[in-house]
Amino acid sequence: RTGFNNPGLDMIKLRIAQRRNSYVLGININKNPSSEGKQAIDDFLSLYRELYDTADYFTINWNSVETEVMEQALTALAAFRETRTKHVPLLLKLPADLTEEALNVVTACIDNYKIDGVIATGPTMDRTYLTASLNRLQKIGTGSISGKGIGDKSFRIVKFLRGHVGKNV
C-alpha cells in the first residue's frame, strides 16, 4: 500500500535512536495529508529541523504538493540548511510521469536550492507499458506501477536530467 502511513514523529525519533549508526539513514519527509499552503511548508520545515541531525540524507517527493508550494518549502529548507555546520544531502524523488515542462522546473529547483541528488523515479499509475493481459491486470488490481513497467519513463527522465544538470547531481 502506498502512502505515508507512520506512527508519528516522536515514535520515529525513538526508533531511530535505538538503531542509530547501524546503517545509512535516509528520511523521506512530507506534509500531513490535510495540510495545504503555508501549513504544508511548515510541516516540511518542522520535520527537517527535528530530524536534521539524525538523517544521513533527506528525500522529498516532488509530486506531493503543488510546484509553488514545493518551491516555497525548498526555500525554507535551504535557508535552514545554511544555518547548520553539518551538511545533510537533500534529494528530490521524481515521479515517472513528469512532462518536459515539469522537468525544466525541477532542473531550475536543483540549481536554485542546491539539491544534492535525484531519485529517478518513483512509481506511476500509468499502465500503458505493461504487457500483461487485461485479465491478469484486473487480477493484480489497482495501484501504482514500478520496476519494468516504468523503465522507459525512468530512462527518459534520467537522460533529460543528465543533459540539463550533468553528472554531479
Show which residues each predicted segment covers.
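Active-site glycine- and acidic-residue-rich loops that bind
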Residues: 32-44, 69, 91-111
